[in-house]
Amino acid sequence: MFKIKHLTLLLLTILTLSVAGCKSQFEKIRLSNDVAKKYQEAVRLYNAKNYSKALILFEDLTQKYRGRAEAEDLNYYYAYTLYRLGDYTTARFQFKSFADVYPTSKNAEECRYMYAYCFYLESPNSTLDQENTYKAIDAMQLFINLYPKSERVAQATQYINDLRGKLEDKAYANAKLYYDLGGYDVTNYKAAVVALQSSQVEFPDIKYSEEMDLLTVKSQYLYAKNSFETRQEERYNEAIQFANEFVESHPESKYLKEVNDLKVESEAGIENAKRVLAEIAKQNAKYKETLEKEAKRDSTRTTIKTPTT
């Protein structure tokens, strides 16, 4: 996908230059076989921030300089040209390639960092798929592991924290969505509990910890409330347990009254479920007794009507 994007950018640039004039000074250099002069012009254009033209020359030179000593600097400029043009997908590939091919270069550390930074720049907002966010975190962490004394470690660490914050936003929003959909399907309340707990395992220091613990109590309470009486006692007890854990974890929370109210309602729900089940058991016993009496009466009638021999 990134190759298509990159080629499109390159072709548009060439087309624009062609329209401007077939034999401009730039075109003469581009078509020239003097690679040294072409490289010099590419660097000049880069420094002049004319990245579109510089890219065309660097693209051509990467093939001609392959295997030569000058290729190191060329590939460094090439990666940064792509970066300056906003083609972060291709740029990160080139930065990584540079760091892998020239691990002892003075620019290897910088390129390894820029590889991770390009992933960071392509990390979308929290409502979208977070594949690049995870990759950015991995790349930043790899950089820190490889260069623990680098002056860039502090910034890389901050970027990781920013990216984790985005993942936390996503996790909280997804879990809350299950809760919001509980009115349509009661099993979504249970799904909310599972999602909330899983998110806190993945992100133990999540900034939404208090809100998520509250939502866990509410989700479990509503799951129990909308269950059959035969399952309510067990499920209400889980809600009570979550409520107790909330109070222990957040003793100064502004949600304490709401949590305690849910605990009281859960306890009342258990008592009500017991009464309903007891009444059902009573009715079942009464019905069973009636059936047994009718069966006995029918048996007696059959005995009386049976003729003797």
What does each model-identified segment do?
Residues 1-9:
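Bacterial N-terminal signal peptides that target proteins for export
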Residues 2, 18-309:
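Acidic, polar-rich low-complexity tracts and alpha-helical solenoid repeat scaffolds
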Residues 10-18:
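Bacterial N-terminal signal peptides
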